[in-house]
Curated annotation (Swiss-Prot):
A cellular-component GO term for this protein: extracellular region
Function recorded in the entry: Pectinolytic enzymes consist of four classes of enzymes: pectine lyase, polygalacturonase, pectin methylesterase and rhamnogalacturonase. Hydrolyzes alpha-D-galacturonopyranosyl-(1,2)-alpha-L-rhamnopyranosyl linkages in the backbone of the hairy regions of pectins.
Protein name: Probable rhamnogalacturonase B
Enzymatic class: hydrolase
Record EC number: 3.2.1.171
UniProtKB keywords: Carbohydrate metabolism, Cell wall biogenesis/degradation, Disulfide bond, Glycoprotein, Glycosidase, Hydrolase, Polysaccharide degradation, Secreted, Signal
Gene this chain is encoded by: rhgB
Taxonomic classification: Eukaryota, Fungi, Dikarya, Ascomycota, Pezizomycotina
UniProt main location, coarse: secreted
Species: Aspergillus niger (strain ATCC MYA-4892 / CBS 513.88 / FGSC A1513)
Catalytic machinery residues: D219, H294
Places the protein is found: Secreted
Length: 558
């Protein structure tokens, strides 16, 4: 249903907040969804959509967008909808997409089920916090097919937010942010199959804030790819996932000013994986702060010879100024996979790596190891020298637990995975993503005036040492009285595809990374890649690496 708290939440939609200086400026839409809805509302039911779980939503969604793309709100009411032809929504400005219903995949083409491109001042949300896309990926996976469609992709979108939305069981990746700017992603739940190639959120963009998100899968939780700059990722709940990371990185890697903060990881492949194998370029200014982990195969895993991707030409990606700070918890078996692994390229030794306030201990056995190669800095096995020459792997083993390693667990930690060949239920969005941390924004479903007011207060006090940036907060909307007439949709049998990120050979063809202009006020931070190894090192085959995308059949677009 469309909510009715316009005055308070419309104000909230433009409320300034203090977010970490890792961002270079404001994030989120420039106008509230309520303002857009008051301008014009395009209800898909008035364009031929039916909430019967069989009538294709593709053409009605494209037609509604065509009428509201220059300013307005496209509305998908509560109910069950089928999507058999994918929706490509191109060129919108000052518009919003409110999905309160559940969209079920019924088509079988590749590509992206919903593809938003070349848009500005955009917001995608569910006013009930129950809107979802159900990809029914198990129907592909039961036939050992891992290259089906992705659920949601944004390409060249600026000043935007996606929030209060659920993505379930994608046949391939769940959510990609491709060459976007000034975006905020929050209050989301993503639940995928227990297999590689089913990424949660992949980001290769500039000035993006991702926070308060839960991911279940067995590949990327929230991952930064190249090129990326000024990315703040915090309050992430990797609940039986692959884990957070950066990469895979190949040729011309260009990644800087990345912060991961308040990351909770349970029963995953790793807490943080920075992965590459050969290649060139750089990753610099990364902060990995306040991590809690339990039951994970790896903890900190920096691997410049990552075996799950084919080697790329080049001496290696240069890693520098990476700070790992305040990590607590336990790993599954420290004698087999130690909590600190920093393996850098012999042709490009990493430097200015700092590991401090790091206390992890093994759940099985009574020892664990720390391993470094061609890595310089301070802490554990890192070598302290200004002469950054390559050196062989050095490993130290300890048999006593470090002080202060004990860390709390989350009550919602899953007790088993969801497999990959049976239907996965649609979850609810949690209200807690990291122990002791309050989400920055209340769920829209819970955002009565009192909750909204408290959200303003929490936004005003987020990082006292940070720069002020504007960010979007849930804004309720109401439809305008007049409903436009339906327009015809255009159905394409083959749509052109946006470029892919620069990645390693296993993730599709490598592209050159554009250089971002250095933003003013950008803080320094260390960074790292993602991936999934451990737990049998399974499921990372090819990572479906942003490849293919040609010949997307059956795309509804305007």
């Amino acid at each position: 249903m469309l909510l009715d708290k316009l005055s308070v939440l419309s104000f909230l939609g433009l409320a300034p907040i203090f977010a970490a200086a890792q961002l270079s400026g404001s994030v989120g839409p420039l106008t509230s969804a309520s303002t857009k809805a008051a301008t014009k509302t395009c209800n898909v039911l008035d364009y031929g959509a039916k909430a019967d779980k069989s009538t294709d939503l593709g053409a009605p969604l494209a037609s509604a967008f065509a009428d509201c793309k220059s300013g307005g709100l496209v509305y998908v009411p509560s109910g069950d909808y089928a999507l058999s032809t994918w929706a490509r929504l191109s060129g919108g400005e000052a518009w919003a997409l409110q999905i309160d219903g559940i969209i079920y995949r019924t088509g079988t083409d590749g590509g992206n089920m919903i593809y938003i491109e070349h848009s500005s001042d955009f917001e995608l949300f569910s006013s009930t916090s129950e809107g979802a896309m159900q990809g029914l990926g198990y129907e592909f996976h039961a036939d050992d097919n891992w290259s089906g469609p992705r659920l949601l992709r944004l390409y060249e979108v600026t000043d935007f937010s996606v929030h209060d939305f659920i993505l379930v069981d994608s046949p391939s990746f769940h959510f990609s942010l491709d060459t976007c700017t000034n975006g905020e992603i929050y209050n989301m739940a993503i639940r995928g199959g227990n297999h590689g190639g089913l990424d949660g959120i992949d980001v290769w963009s500039n000035n993006i804030w991702v926070h308060d998100v839960e991911v279940t899968n067995k590949d990327e939780c929230v991952t930064v790819k190249s090129p990326s700059k000024n990315i703040l990722i915090e309050s992430i709940y990797c609940n039986w996932s692959g884990g957070c990371g950066m990469g895979s990185f190949g040729s011309d890697t260009n990644v800087s000013d990345i912060t991961y903060r308040n990351i909770y990881t349970w029963s995953s492949n790793n807490m943080m994986l920075i992965k590459s194998n050969g290649g060139s370029g750089f990753v610099e200014n990364v902060l990995l702060e306040n991590f809690i982990g339990h039951g994970n195969a790896y903890s900190l895993d920096i691997d410049s010879y990552w075996a799950s991707m084919s080697a790329v030409d080049g001496d290696g990606v240069q890693l520098s100024n990476i700070t790992v700070k305040n990590w607590k918890g336990t790993e599954a078996y420290g004698a087999e996979r130690g909590p600190v692994k920093v393996v850098c390229a012999d042709g490009a030794p990493c430097y200015d790596i700092t590991i401090e306030d790091f206390a992890m201990w093994t759940e099985e056995g009574d020892s664990q190891w720390y391993s470094c190669e061609s890595a310089y800095g301070s802490g554990y096995c890192l070598q302290d020298s200004d002469d950054h020459v390559s050196y062989s792997v050095t490993t130290s083993t300890v048999s006593s637990a470090p002080s202060g390693y004990s860390a709390t667990s989350m009550a919602a930690d899953l007790t088993t995975d969801f497999g990959s060949t049976v239907s996965i239920p649609i979850p609810t969005i949690p209200t807690s993503f990291y122990p002791g941390a309050t989400p920055y924004s209340a769920l829209m479903a819970n955002s009565a005036s009192t909750a909204a007011a408290s959200s303003i207060a929490s936004h005003a006090t987020v990082h006292s040492s940070s720069a002020s940036v504007a960010a979007s907060v849930p804004s309720a909307v109401a439809p305008s009285e007049s409903i436009p007439a339906a327009t015809s949709a255009v159905v394409s049998s083959a749509a052109a595809i946006a470029p892919s990120p620069a990645v390693g050979a296993q993730e599709g063809s490598t592209t050159s990374a554009p250089s971002f202009a250095a933003p003013s006020g950008a803080g320094n931070s260390p960074q790292g890649p993602t991936g999934a190894s451990g737990f049998g090192e399974k499921g990372q085959q090819g990572e479906q690496g942003e490849q293919g995308e040609q010949g997307e059949q059956g795309v509804c677009y305007v």
